[in-house]
């Protein structure tokens, strides 16, 4: 009887431990769901973790960023040229500046242009190298070009997508998401993703306002292409 009682006590203690661990795991899960910032940090970590291993990246380009004249870091972006070749090539060429001067008399080059629209909890937008206020920009194909396809989706932070003023109005303006923006699917062409430097994107995001007007001067100090 003494052995049976000992086993009973051991089993009881084991069940208590199992129950405690289960409740702790449930609490952790509920905390993640209740706190969006936790989920955003997890998404950012996953984004950086898989960055260099993303399948389908055909080119890598970069932005070196300055905020109010001070270096803020580099954003490395992968382009999906197999899925959206025309859109990816437009962006790649604008990063290198290899196409020279456009029809508007301005260099087809992101270098020196600003992030003119920054909305925290949404996205950062740039690419207007002709006017700098969101009313300009030019593609390497002339002025505007058609939406290539909407195969890629805005499924999290760090996706690169074309800004537009309606269907088939793509130029040089782009945005990088800082959250999931699924309502933009089917309206804006996704063509790339941040591979590294999401912390720089967050620095830029911190300079935004609900109005979209930046609180600081955020400049693409240098841009170009790097080898795969």
Swiss-Prot record:
Cell compartment(s), UniProt: Endoplasmic reticulum
Glycosylation is annotated at 170
Q: What is its EC number?
A: 5.2.1.8
GO MF entries: peptidyl-prolyl cis-trans isomerase activity
Q: Which keywords are on file for this protein?
A: Chaperone, Endoplasmic reticulum, Glycoprotein, Isomerase, Rotamase, Signal
User: One matching Pfam family, short form?
Assistant: Pro_isomerase
Fetch the SUPFAM superfamilies from UniProt: Cyclophilin-like (SSF50891)
Q: What does this protein do?
A: PPIases accelerate the folding of proteins. It catalyzes the cis-trans isomerization of proline imidic peptide bonds in oligopeptides.
Q: What is the catalytic activity of this protein?
A: [protein]-peptidylproline (omega=180) = [protein]-peptidylproline (omega=0)
Please give the biological process terms from Gene Ontology that the record holds. Answer: protein folding
> Could you identify this protein by its name?
Peptidyl-prolyl cis-trans isomerase CYP21-2
| Any one GO CC term of the record | endoplasmic reticulum
Q: Which family does it belong to?
A: Belongs to the cyclophilin-type PPIase family.
Residues making up the signal peptide according to the UniProt record: 1-24
UniProt keyword annotation of Nuclease present: no
Q: Which InterPro entries match?
A: Cyclophilin-like_dom_sf, Cyclophilin-type_PPIase_CS, Cyclophilin-type_PPIase_dom
Transmembrane residue ranges = none
Instruction: Tell me the ranges covered by the PPIase cyclophilin-type domain, including all copies.
Output: 62-225
The species this protein was found in: Arabidopsis thaliana (Mouse-ear cress)
What does the record say about tissue specificity? Answer: Expressed in leaves, flowers, roots and stems.
